[in-house]
């Protein structure tokens, strides 16, 4: 039996509390910071120093003084942290946790799309690979996409990708006509209008709120649309006591933590398309987090020429959303 196998068996036999204690001890020993997305498991969020959306986590990665960044999210997030911090070690509990939305935009196809529209600038959702970021002019998140698009001169043609639903929402909000890449998040795209109407009838006192990665038919049923951080702020400040939440249900942990007296109902899915959970986010388990810190592996690396190209579009986002 190998040492690695022994360590995996040991980690599997530890309680959540014991693993959390070990993770905290390792964090101090390594001078590490743990960043986690709102869609990760509750115990991962408990272990994290900062839990946030893509923009908040990118800013945290840019500003940290830690020597090691441990990123519990999906691959493009850890990759973005490495792009911003080439001199730091960036670890990820499970590099196999990819993002199907990011994967829906292959480098060569996106390059051809750009070449077909040479006068357009490309504003690209952060849910994309480093190669796509290098091919882009400005990166955005769901928190700042509208704000960034509003800063572009009205005569300038815009390519927006890879999420068609977020792009359509930004078009509606800004009145801009953009060329949309036809990607989507499988979790958010699975919501349908008929089930939102049924949920509102079933819970008449609850307010429907939704993430802009949902389809337009769902968004028109919502009384508030926003990024994960915006949804959290809204529910925390709202006088309403119950909410139907149309986004990945991992966010309910933070909502309940911030507003313990309120009720949060996961929006229902079509039984014929019941993909309500981001299984990639859930690949970040507490034992994997512990083991990646013990082993200082898997480590995320980015080729320097790729990193430099991608950094320009990320920096442009951070400047435009400051």
UniProtKB/Swiss-Prot annotation:
Cellular component GO terms held in the UniProt record: cytosol
EC number: 2.5.1.72
Cofactor annotation comment: Binds 1 [4Fe-4S] cluster per subunit.
Enzyme class of the recorded protein, top EC level: transferase
Compartment(s) of residence: Cytoplasm
Cofactor field: [4Fe-4S] cluster
Gene Ontology MF, one: quinolinate synthetase A activity
List of residues binding iminosuccinate: 37, 54, 125-127, 142, 211-213, 228
Binding site for [4Fe-4S] cluster: 99, 185, 278
Pathway the protein contributes to: Cofactor biosynthesis; NAD(+) biosynthesis; quinolinate from iminoaspartate: step 1/1
Database matches in SUPFAM superfamilies: NadA-like (SSF142754)
GO terms of biological process kind: 'de novo' NAD biosynthetic process from L-aspartate
Catalysed conversion reaction: iminosuccinate + dihydroxyacetone phosphate = quinolinate + phosphate + 2 H2O + H(+)
Protein family membership: Belongs to the quinolinate synthase family. Type 2 subfamily.
Function: Catalyzes the condensation of iminoaspartate with dihydroxyacetone phosphate to form quinolinate.
Annotated protein name in UniProt: Quinolinate synthase
């Amino acid at each position: 039996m190998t040492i690695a196998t022994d360590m995996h068996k040991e980690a599997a036999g530890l309680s959540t509390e014991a693993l959390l204690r070990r993770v905290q001890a390792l964090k101090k020993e390594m001078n590490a910071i743990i960043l986690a997305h709102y869609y990760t498991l509750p115990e991962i969020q408990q272990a994290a120093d900062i839990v946030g959306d893509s923009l908040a986590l990118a800013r945290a990665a840019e500003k940290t003084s830690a020597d090691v960044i441990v990123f519990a999210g999906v691959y493009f997030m850890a990759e973005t942290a490495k792009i911003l911090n080439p001199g730091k070690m960036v670890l990820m509990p499970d590099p196999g946790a990819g993002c199907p939305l990011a994967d829906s935009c292959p480098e060569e196809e996106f390059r051809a799309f750009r070449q077909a529209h040479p006068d357009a600038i490309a504003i690209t959702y952060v849910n994309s690979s480093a190669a796509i970021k290098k091919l882009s002019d400005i990166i955005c998140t769901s928190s700042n996409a509208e704000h960034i698009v509003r800063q572009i001169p009205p005569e300038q043609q815009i390519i927006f990708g890879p999420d068609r639903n977020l792009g359509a929402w930004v078009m509606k909000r800004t009145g801009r006509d953009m060329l949309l890449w036809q990607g989507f998040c499988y979790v958010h795209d699975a919501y349908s209008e008929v089930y939102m109407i049924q949920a509102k009838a079933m819970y008449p006192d609850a307010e429907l709120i939704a993430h802009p990665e949902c389809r337009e038919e769902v968004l028109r049923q919502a009384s508030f649309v926003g990024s994960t951080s915006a949804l959290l702020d809204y529910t925390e400040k709202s006088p309403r006591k119950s909410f139907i939440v149309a986004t990945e249900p991992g966010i309910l942990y933070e909502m309940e933590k911030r507003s313990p007296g309120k009720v949060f109902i996961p929006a229902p899915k079509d039984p014929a398309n019941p993909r309500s959970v981001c299984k990639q986010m859930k690949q970040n388990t507490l034992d994997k987090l512990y083991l990646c810190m013990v082993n200082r592996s898997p480590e995320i690396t980015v080729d320097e020429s790729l990193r430099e190209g991608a950094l320009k579009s990320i920096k442009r986002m951070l400047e435009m959303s400051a």
